[in-house]
Each structure stands twice: as C-alpha cells, then as structure tokens.
A protein has these predicted regions:
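Gly/Gly-Pro- and Ser/Thr-rich, intrinsically disordered tail segments characteristic of DNA damage-repair
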Residues: 1-201
Length: 201
C-alpha cells in the first residue's frame, strides 16, 4: 500500500464571505435603519395576496419565523391591514393567544415592506467587489453569487501580516476581520466569513 503525505500538498488560504441578508440589508442601510434590528422584507407585488418574499432581515425572520423565500399569505398577518391573520395562523399551527396576536401586530405595524431594486443591489455588490480587490488580485477573487464569494488570500497573508510568529490560520483570521470591517464601513452591510485551507473550485 502506498502512503501519501498530505502535509506536502500546497497550502491555500481561502475566505468564503457571505453578506448577511444582503437585499434586506441594502434596503435597511439605504433608509438609515439598522440591518440587524429592523424588521424588513423585500417583496414583489406586495399589493397582491400572492406577493413573493424575496429577502428578509434577520429580525423579520426571527419574529415571523420565515426564511427568505415565501409568499405573503404565509405570514401571520395581513400585509395590507397589518392585522393578525387567524386563518394563516391556524393553517400553520401557530398560537392565537392574545399575547401572541398583540406581539405579531406590533411587529407587523413597524415592519418595512419594500419592492426589489436589483440595480441598487448590483451597485452595492460592485462596491464590495472593489473592497475585495484591496486584499487580493482580481484573479484570486471568485464571485459565487451577488451576495457571496471566495477570496484566495494565500498570496496576501504575509503582505498584510508580515509577522512570522503568527500562524497562517491566525493571519487569515486577521485579514478576514479586516475585510468584514471595511465592508461594513463602506456599505453598512454585515458579513460572515468562513475560512479554510481548501481549493475553492
């Protein structure tokens, strides 16, 4: 049997960066609202009972228990009146106690519902791509979608963190944090970063 020493494999330092609730965050920032504390959803045809929820803020998801994609009729409140929907609640097995009804209606009143603006999201994405280029060459940046992508920071580690006493893992962590901070300062968007020594292809 032939044994292979994987420690001899080339090392690569990859950061996978994901913008947190990107569309909803862009809409919040554009309105001077906190993207993590505001209940907001991006909905097409909000005037229609079958309006499509394209994106939502973390607070919206927490309060109403919904993911990014869904229909307005899946919500526990009526989009037009912002009143509790007993029909939807029963259909989904949700409680109908007075406390829960009041809770939903209070949040429904303050929830911001906006139409999608793809041109705006693309423009913010371009700003973020420029930030990536402050940390890596264009050939080392691999967009995955409008709100996430890989950056190969292998060639950048020692340039940004030349201290030889710091491990590659810690250097990757330092640079990733710097990227997150710059994205937030430039766009107001929060992001998450996953790091590894793997090939992004």
């Amino acid at each position: 049997m032939t044994w292979f020493d994987y420690s001899l494999e080339p090392k690569s330092d990859i950061a996978f960066i994901d913008m947190k609730s990107f569309y909803a965050s862009v809409e919040c920032v554009d309105r001077g609202l906190h993207p993590l504390k505001t209940s907001l959803c991006v909905m097409s045809r909000a005037d229609n009972s079958t309006g499509l929820i394209l994106a939502s803020s973390p607070m919206f998801k927490k309060v109403f228990g919904k993911s990014n994609v869904g229909r307005s009729y899946d919500l526990p409140f009526d989009v037009k009146t912002r009143k509790f929907s007993y029909y939807n609640a029963r259909k989904q097995g949700l409680p109908t106690t007075i406390d829960y009804v009041n809770y939903i209606e209070e949040w429904a009143k303050s929830t911001v519902i906006v139409p999608p603006r793809m041109d705006t999201y693309i423009a913010v994405n371009m700003d973020i791509q420029k930030i990536f280029q402050d940390f890596a060459a264009p050939d080392d940046i691999y967009p995955y979608s409008i709100d996430e992508g890989f950056i190969d920071l292998t060639s950048s580690l020692n340039y940004f963190v030349p201290d030889k006493s710091i491990s590659r893992k810690d250097k990757l962590d330092i640079i990733s944090a710097a990227i997150q901070k710059k994205i937030w300062r430039k766009t107001g968007i929060y992001s998450t970063v996953g790091m590894s020594n793997a090939n992004p292809y």
